[in-house]
């Protein structure tokens, strides 16, 4: 083992939370070491958020081209297209490489020492790193920030290998299967399943719950289910997985009837879990919430000067939550007064149509004892949506009846992910219905549906 490396802040994990914490710490003049065994950017940048959106975009463009090869109301006609999936993957990888290089450059710019290797906890002040290039390095610190992220949940009855793949393999196909079965009807399975279907693959989704996206209310998920069926995706809802079969998988429905679903490949997408095993984290004896490290509203763990952020600290497992926590921890270590208490953290499903939620749903508001106004505005009445051939879906607002304080937003439709900023900002700033309704929204935009939903809640929507 080489000479001991000493630092003020040691960060384990170079994903969105870890690298943002490192950059902010560097900006604040805190000597910082970041340890990452894989590529900078973590799951999100390398095998999650970014590559999946690239594949989704490529699949959508291919579907458009196929549509134009038949009949298009726009008058566009092209010859039947083909796709070179290897080139698609190269394009996707180039985006990832550019972004990871950018992260590395930012860390270097702010004086962060990046150590490539796998950290193993020794105690609350030190780790041993198995260096990627061979050998080992002991690092000691004043503050230890745990940002190890999460990993895919595996199914013992359907182990990975051969034709059974995880989202990581699904994002880098060497070739496209003829038929794909997706196990899991959550956002990961549906995003990838939709992309594969648009690329021409026959897709079936198996979900144990009676509907897709069970974490969202049915009014939001119904348009997604309808769109999937129109696309030709087979939905086996309320079906439990029994295991692999010779030609695919075996499932059982609610009535106890078993059947085989044929597949060339099976994608397991049944969720993620904190990466809290395999690097001696348990030796610290930290308070835990199941597999997640328990933290307070400053991301402090039960051990002094040991912090945890992002997926390792539990739900919601979102990159933007991890980034916000990472920035906050760096500022706390620098002596600033901070607290992680967002009014809302937006969440997006990049299905087709997309789904975005921020704050309380009508049901959640009711459960919280709030008497609320709930109003929706359909994209069928929005001019911009019509010009985009995307008049499916709606924007919904939830606001207190007594003072009109907005407590929640939901939307389903084309490109509604871009409304998430407006939703979160209005909630964070304590906007009331009158604030949204009285703000002039540019025309023609999808965002006008936000204003119209607020107007409708007040009883005087203009375009419906």
From Swiss-Prot:
Q: Which domain of life is it from?
A: Bacteria
* Entry keyword Translocase: no
Q: Which Pfam families match?
A: Pyr_redox_2, Pyr_redox_dim
Keywords for this protein? Cytoplasm, Disulfide bond, FAD, Flavoprotein, NAD, Oxidoreductase, Redox-active center
- UniProt keyword Flavoprotein, yes or no: yes
Cofactor(s) the protein requires to work: FAD
Q: Name one GO biological process term.
A: 2-oxoglutarate metabolic process
Its Enzyme Commission number(s) read 1.8.1.4
- Assigned GO CC terms: cytoplasm
What remark does the entry make about the cofactor? Binds 1 FAD per subunit.
Q: Where in the cell is it found?
A: Cytoplasm
Q: Which residues make up the binding site for FAD?
A: 36-44, 53, 119, 311, 319
InterPro entries referenced in this protein's UniProt entry, alphabetically: Class-I_Pyr_Nuc-Dis_Oxidored, FAD/NAD-bd_sf, FAD/NAD-binding_dom, FAD/NAD-linked_Rdtase_dimer_sf, Lipoamide_DH, Pyr_nuc-diS_OxRdtase, Pyr_nucl-diS_OxRdtase_dimer, Pyr_OxRdtase_I_AS
Q: Which residues form the active site?
A: 443
Q: Which Gene3D superfamilies match?
A: 3.30.390.30, FAD/NAD(P)-binding domain
Q: Which residues bind NAD(+)?
A: 184-188, 207, 269-272
Q: What else is known?
A: The active site is a redox-active disulfide bond.
The subunit structure is: Homodimer.
Q: What is this protein called?
A: Dihydrolipoyl dehydrogenase
Protein's gene: lpdV
